[in-house]
């Protein structure tokens, strides 16, 4: 069942008024593939625009907080934790993981996915002058905890909470 559609098939925001406040958490990831020389420039701190990872981290945090402004049917949430981690993966990629938490009536999957996506876009923006062939890939939800639908772990069967 698509929860964002009413009985006539019109888009609407889900009413969470009567849902219990519970602890909720989500973790998402994204990868940015690039030339090895581009990754080396980022890791060594040699980028003329500054610390690429620091800027991407802040962009991801800001994006999580702005998710409801970007995705029309997302509820505005009072997130209590946002963490964005960036690390070199092999010699040609950056792996981004983003986690979001709150005590609330709806999940934080979209906030975590938005954080990872915007951090990846920020890396692309900062490095496009030296590597226009970068690829943002594998944006996905890794884990979701809390709420009625239970515990989800990517690549595993759904686990109830």
Swiss-Prot record:
Superkingdom: Bacteria
Q: Recorded GO terms, molecular function?
A: cyclic pyranopterin monophosphate synthase activity
Q: Which residues bind substrate?
A: 73-75, 110-111
Q: In which pathway does it act?
A: Cofactor biosynthesis; molybdopterin biosynthesis
Q: What is its EC number?
A: 4.6.1.17
Reactions catalysed according to its record: (8S)-3',8-cyclo-7,8-dihydroguanosine 5'-triphosphate = cyclic pyranopterin phosphate + diphosphate
Leading EC class: lyase
Active-site residues per Swiss-Prot or TrEMBL entry: 125
GO biological process terms held by the UniProt record:
Mo-molybdopterin cofactor biosynthetic process
Q: Which UniProt keywords apply?
A: Lyase, Molybdenum cofactor biosynthesis
Q: Which HAMAP family match?
A: MoaC_B
Function per UniProt: Catalyzes the conversion of (8S)-3',8-cyclo-7,8-dihydroguanosine 5'-triphosphate to cyclic pyranopterin monophosphate (cPMP).
User: What is its quaternary makeup?
Assistant: Homohexamer; trimer of dimers.
What protein family does this chain belong to?
A: Belongs to the MoaC family.
Name under which the protein is recorded = Cyclic pyranopterin monophosphate synthase
Organism equals: Pseudomonas syringae pv. syringae (strain B728a)
């Amino acid at each position: 069942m698509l929860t964002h559609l009413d009985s006539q098939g019109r888009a609407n925001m889900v009413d969470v008024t009567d849902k219990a406040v519970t602890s909720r958490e989500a973790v998402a990831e994204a990868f940015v593939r690039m030339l090895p020389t581009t990754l080396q420039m980022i890791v060594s701190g040699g980028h003329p625009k500054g610390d690429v990872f620091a800027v991407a981290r802040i962009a991801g945090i800001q994006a999580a907080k702005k998710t409801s402004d970007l995705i029309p049917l997302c509820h505005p949430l009072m997130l209590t934790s946002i963490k964005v981690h960036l690390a070199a993966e092999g010699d040609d990629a950056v792996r981004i993981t983003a986690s979001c938490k709150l005590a609330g009536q709806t999940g934080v999957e979209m906030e975590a996915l938005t954080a990872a996506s915007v951090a990846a876009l920020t890396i692309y923006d900062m490095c496009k002058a030296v590597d226009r062939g970068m690829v943002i890939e594998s944006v996905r939800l890794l884990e979701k905890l809390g709420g009625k639908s239970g515990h989800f772990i990517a690549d595993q069967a759904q686990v109830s909470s």
